Swiss-Prot record:
Keywords: Cytoplasm, Ubl conjugation pathway
Protein's recorded name: SPRY domain-containing SOCS box protein 2
Annotated SOCS box domain residues: 222-264
Compositional bias segments (type: Low complexity): 21-34
Gene Ontology MF annotations: ubiquitin-like ligase-substrate adaptor activity
Entry-linked SUPFAM superfamilies: Concanavalin A-like lectins/glucanases, SOCS box-like
Function text: Substrate recognition component of a SCF-like ECS (Elongin BC-CUL2/5-SOCS-box protein) E3 ubiquitin-protein ligase complex which mediates the ubiquitination and subsequent proteasomal degradation of target proteins. Negatively regulates nitric oxide (NO) production and limits cellular toxicity in activated macrophages by mediating the ubiquitination and proteasomal degradation of NOS2. Acts as a bridge which links NOS2 with the ECS E3 ubiquitin ligase complex components ELOC and CUL5.
Cellular localization per UniProt: Cytoplasm; Cytoplasm, Cytosol
Pathway(s) of this molecule: Protein modification; protein ubiquitination
B30.2/SPRY domain boundaries: 26-221
Membership in a protein family: Belongs to the SPSB family.
CC annotations in GO: cytosol; SCF ubiquitin ligase complex
Length: 264
């Protein structure tokens, strides 16, 4: 796995690598992704919900795929069948680059988030009930109309990540974070402060006849014991705080311990 970022705090606003320098993966993510994937029945159990989508969306293959009908001036969304309030969850979204259009947003939503709008927009993330990453524009949306939306992942001004066909969504309901992973590298937290909610996989789309697939990769619960090494590392990093993590390399510690504390 690549280096990752987890944000701290209680606000469900977008987070930024520039603001949160704690580059660490959610505990258990590597183990989750290394485990055998759920069987086809479980995949469908966690797939798109044909009863919880815009009227312009057709869910296919028992929930593994949906197709948006070519309706003009409409943005259409869909939720997954299962909502998550506990545990660490990951799922793969497959969305061809040529089928994204002007607004292709991937993320999560509560059961109250709207699933259709009579115009083209980043519907997912447009109000307080959803959180999304526009994989075409590289912007994060929550309670947003698109103005001054933060870039994700954070980088030099004007630079934007090209998101390939497949990406992973990583929802950690124990820490209350939502992030994304591409090519085996977790990009860090996009949103934080999500604890206490029930959130469903969701996307919103504008491209006529686009087909978006979902593949649930599994769950890891907090009840599964964390290693003493990992807990010790968290305690040390928490004691130092974000502003002093850069001083780890100057501490009188063995090189191997310094590397471990820095996730190297």
């Amino acid at each position: 796995m690549g280096q990752t970022a987890l944000a701290r705090g209680s606000s469900s606003t977008p987070s930024s690598h520039a603001l949160y320098s704690d580059l660490s993966p959610p505990e258990g993510l590597e183990e989750l992704l290394s485990a055998p994937p759920p069987d086809l029945g479980a995949q469908r159990h966690h797939g798109w919900n044909p009863k919880d989508c815009s009227e312009n969306i057709d869910v296919k293959e028992g929930g593994l795929c949906f197709e948006r009908r070519p309706v003009a001036q409409s943005t259409d969304g869909v939720r997954g069948k299962r909502g998550y309030s506990r545990g660490l969850h990951a799922w793969e979204i497959s969305w061809p680059l040529e089928q994204r259009g002007t607004h292709a947003v991937v993320g999560v939503a509560t059961a109250l988030a709207p699933l259709q709008a009579d115009h083209y927009a980043a519907l997912l993330g447009s109000n307080s009930e959803s959180w999304g990453w526009d994989i075409g524009r590289g912007k994060l949306y929550h309670q947003s109309k698109g103005l001054e939306a933060p870039q994700y992942p954070a980088g030099p001004q004007g630079e934007q990540l090209v998101v390939p066909e497949r990406l992973l969504v990583v929802l950690d309901m124990e820490e209350g974070t939502l992030g994304y992973s591409i090519g085996g590298t977790y990009l860090g937290p996009a949103f934080r402060g999500l604890k206490g909610r029930t959130l469903y996989p969701s996307v919103s789309a504008v491209w006529g006849q686009c087909q978006v697939r979902i593949r649930y990769l599994g769950e890891r619960r907090a009840e599964e014991p964390q290693s003493l090494l990992h807990l010790s590392r968290l305690c040390v990093r928490h004691a130092l705080g974000d502003t002093r993590l850069g001083q780890i390399s100057s501490l009188p510690l063995p090189p191997a311990m310094k590397r471990y504390l820095l996730y190297k």
